[in-house]
Amino acid sequence: MDTLLRTHNRLELLYPLHELAKRHFLSPSPNPQNPNFKFFSRKPYQKKCRNGYIGVSSNQLLDLVPEIKKEHLEFDLPLYDPSKALTLDLAVVGGGPLARSCSTSLGGGLSVVSIDPNPKLIWPNNYGVWVDEFEDMDLLDCLDATWSGAIVYVDDRSTKNLSRPYARVNRKNLKSKMMKKCVSNGVRFHQATVVKAMHEEEKSYLICSDGVTIDARVVLDATGFSRCLVQYDKPYNPGYQVAYGILAEVEEHPFDVDKMVFMDWRDSHLNGKAELNERNAKIPTFLYAMPFSSNRIFLEETSLVARPGLKMEDIQERMVARLNHLGIRIKSIEEDERCVIPMGGPLPVIPQRVVGIGGTAGMVHPSTGYMVARTLAAAPIVANSIVQYLVSDSGLSGNDLSADVWKDLWPIERRRQREFFCFGMDILLKLDLEGTRRFFDAFFDLEPRYWHGFLSSRLFLPELVPFGLSLFSHASNTCKLEIMAKGTLPLVNMINNLVQDRD
């Protein structure tokens, strides 16, 4: 789904997953932490069975995954020159779309360095977005496949047709567009990672993995979920969204190529598989699919949110059972990806000297795992705030300047919105498969302005209250009882947090 924390043939995990956020798990790792589990084979992947194609089993599916093929943009980068020992206005740490968007927005008139170990690397992730979200940001030229609408399979008898265009992001076009603007705005690049930050009253020092120290008045951490620069002072207890996806050539698939499959909660593929069926009944997974043609499709099995998160092996086993049931025969796999997204949990210390944005600043939608459009839209807000304070003659100290930027990033209306989303996550965490189906049956019956706004983080507390009441009124009697039984304590916690949180 719409996520930033996706890895291509890489997953560095120690279970339970709540330990995950203590590590920079997007760092390249040649092997998974479990040496006995084979995520992918280095054998040739055009493997055939008696009918010519794979009738999928877990091992056969993974044997089809090719070796990693890293793609890079081809152009000259203006590099940061450490010999000049200048104090820069801003250092942006990170290499994902958000880091690049911030660098793009902050160039021009300011001295900016982007610290990224692989600045030319094309992101390997599959990003899906609602078309209207990218239209609002003038990024329609960065979409490479569009569907006129989406479909939700609640169960084998009930479907929801969503009249909202959906698209896959063209990763190369998006990065190329951002990089060109960075270069034209005078942004410099330093190919390294930051291992430590030290602060004085007027500036900060970033010590990089290559031994270079970079001085900057403001440090912006856009490294995802590493939590290596931004500090937290509360126990880290998020839920986790976990998914496994493949971009594959198939003999055929049963889906309409004019619609993407937003959620498929059907479980008939688990009939006769007692243990797997029982696990799915307790902590369900759904299929997310983007059909590009009748024989090329992106398929992803996803656990919406769980605490602790499901193991990747479990996700893959469920996916294999689903593909076999749907009669999807895989001819070859272009790429695969693994996704682990911390959702909810506490915000970082606000304010603090390093300014965080994106995953490291708690900006993932706690109920959905969505982040791409929300954070890309936030980048210019943060950029304008930083520019405003840097060019003013107020004489702010480094701490005061960062505090003002944090305030603009997390104003009280955004904090209240996030509290409501965390309330939603806490309810979803307690729902089994049948409860989850009942919830989304009601959710997608809401007026489009409500479910559009909720998924895209466009509703604030004055709109979220009537949204919640409308959802409750659309829910079945059983669903209402579940919400009251399982949502009472989360509701009390939310109200308490809202009362205590004041500007």
Curated annotation (Swiss-Prot):
Keywords: Carotenoid biosynthesis, Chloroplast, Chromoplast, Isomerase, Membrane, NAD, Plastid, Transit peptide
Keyword rRNA-binding: no
Annotated binding of NAD(+), by residue: 90-117
Cellular component GO terms held in the UniProt record: chloroplast membrane; chromoplast membrane
InterPro entries linked: FAD/NAD-bd_sf, Lycopene_cyclase_b/e
Primary localization: plastid
Subcellular compartments: Plastid, Chloroplast; Plastid, Chromoplast; Plastid, Chromoplast membrane; Plastid, Chloroplast membrane
Catalytic activity: a carotenoid psi-end group = a carotenoid beta-end derivative
Domain of life of the source: Eukaryota
GO molecular function annotations of the record: intramolecular oxidoreductase activity; oxidoreductase activity, acting on paired donors, with incorporation or reduction of molecular oxygen
Keyword Plastid: yes
Biological processes, Gene Ontology terms: carotenoid biosynthetic process
Pathway field: Carotenoid biosynthesis; beta-carotene biosynthesis; Carotenoid biosynthesis; beta-zeacarotene biosynthesis
Transit peptide location: 1-85
EC numbers for this chain: 5.5.1.19
Function according to Swiss-Prot or TrEMBL: Catalyzes the double cyclization reaction which converts lycopene to beta-carotene and neurosporene to beta-zeacarotene.
Family: Belongs to the lycopene cyclase family.
The protein's name: Lycopene beta cyclase, chloroplastic/chromoplastic
Source organism per UniProt: Narcissus pseudonarcissus
